Curated annotation (Swiss-Prot):
Keywords in alphabetical order: Host nucleus, Host-virus interaction, Transport, Virion
Assigned protein family: Belongs to the influenza viruses NEP family.
SUPFAM superfamilies: Nonstructural protein ns2, Nep, M1-binding domain
Any one of the GO BP annotations: exit of virus from host cell nucleus through nuclear pore
Function: Mediates the nuclear export of encapsidated genomic RNAs (ribonucleoproteins, RNPs). Acts as an adapter between viral RNPs complexes and the nuclear export machinery of the cell. Possesses no intrinsic RNA-binding activity, but includes a C-terminal M1-binding domain. This domain is believed to allow recognition of RNPs bound to the protein M1.
InterPro entries membership: Flu_NS2
Record-given protein name: Nuclear export protein
Motif Nuclear export signal per record, residues: 12-21, 85-94
Anything else known: Average number present in a viral particle is estimated to be 130-200 molecules.
Subunit note: Interacts with protein M1. May interact with host nucleoporin RAB/HRB and exportin XPO1/CRM1.
A GO cellular-component term linked to this record: virion component
């Protein structure tokens, strides 16, 4: 697995964990938990690739990985829509800024996972 991809993903998670949204912090903590889950999933795929040493062998051996990856993309799309919705309904400008930052980070996470998935295809 590309070490730059791993460190970039970890940086995104670190920045997300440092965000404080006041009354919305519970929502953010739930999102961070889901980000951690996505990171663990992505890392487990990377470890499987390293153990196998052959992407084609991994693909033929594990026919469910595409379905799992699709589910993770659905999860992150849902998170993006949830943040967009919260951004629209929030009237506090400080929280709006934080949700805009969260949205930007979510889009970065989606890009990281997409990049990694293309490595598996």
């Amino acid at each position: 697995m590309d070490s730059n991809t791993v460190s970039s993903f970890q940086d995104i998670l670190m920045r997300m964990s440092k965000m404080q949204l006041g009354s919305s912090s519970e929502d953010l903590n739930g999102m961070i938990t889901q980000f951690e889950s996505l990171k663990l999933y992505r890392d487990s795929l990377g470890e499987a690739v390293m153990r196998m040493g052959d992407l084609h062998s991994l693909q033929s051996r594990n026919g469910k990985w595409r379905e799992q990856l699709s589910q993770k993309f659905e999860e992150i799309r849902w998170l993006i829509e949830e943040v967009r919705h919260r951004l629209k309904v929030t009237e506090n400008s400080f929280e709006q800024i934080r949700f805009m930052q969260a949205l930007q980070l979510l889009l970065e996470v989606e890009q990281e996972i997409r990049t990694f998935s293309f490595q598996l295809i």
